[in-house]
Each structure stands twice: as structure tokens, then as C-alpha cells.
Amino acid sequence: MTDKLIIRRTIAEELAQILALYPLAFPDEELRPVVSRLIEGEAQVLSLATFKGEALVAHVLFTIFGSEEDKGAGALLAPLGVVPDHQGQGVGNALVKDGLKRLGAMGVRQVFVFGDPAYYGRFGFKTERQVLTPYPLSEEYGDDAWQSMPLAGRAPLAAGRMSLPEPWMEPALW
């Protein structure tokens, strides 16, 4: 019998499992400090994980924020990690879709991501030019890597710079 995949909000006791996932999913990046600070800190986040039995096989973090010009709710999708033996099986897709649905129910108006346009475009993300990141972006995915998507027909955030919690205020993260 195979274990069914379950997506749910994480709890504080699962932080060690969450942090163990990221070096496997991103061996060339050190994401554990920002993930830990966001989950344990005072930032408003939506932390979701996919479990296969007791094993955490994927995690996504959405940080809720406003912008300089608009205090309306936006969310930053980052990071999203899937353990290597579950990549390419739709686990990340299901996790993102679940998160977008939950964010819509929470009243979030627009979700932002910095990543591969081919991957995130399948969810409806499009290049973003109005709401700016706190620091210049790396050239990893080109000019179209900064993307956003309004939720449930809601109006997008006003143009301006994102106002993110302190853990995201590290230039190296961008």
C-alpha cells in the first residue's frame, strides 16, 4: 500500500523537517536561515507542506505583505522546495495550487514570485513591472522572472516597492 500525499498547514514542531528539505531541494542555496526566521518570527506567513505518511516531501512558504503605496494584502511565494525523489511528479504544482486557493480565502489580492517563467506561468503568473522588489534581482531567469498573479478577480496592488518583513531584507536573497 502506498501512502497518500496530504497537503496541510505546518506546525511549529515540524520546523526541523522543513529545514532538512531545503538543502536536498536546493543544494547550491542556503535557504534555511530565512525560512527559519520567517516561520519562527512575527511575519505573517502561510506555511504549507506535502506529507507522504510521516515524511515531509515538499514545502512552500507564502509571506503576506503590502507595498509602499498600498497596504492591501500581497503574498510572496518563496521558497518552494520538493525532495528530489518527488520532483517532476506534480507535487510542487499541487502545493502551489492549494496555497493560491487558501490565500484567496484569506483575502490576499495578488501573489508574487521570482522564478522560472515557464514553471510559474502554468499557474497564471505573468511578468510584473509595477510592484518592485526591495533589491535588484539576479539575472538567473532573465527579465521575466519577477512575476505576479491577481487572485479571484481582485484588483492588483498599487505600483510601488514591496514592504516585506525583515527576514527578506537581505540583498543576497534577491
Predicted regions and their residues:
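A short, glycine- and basic residue-enriched loop/turn
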Residues: 68-69, 74, 117
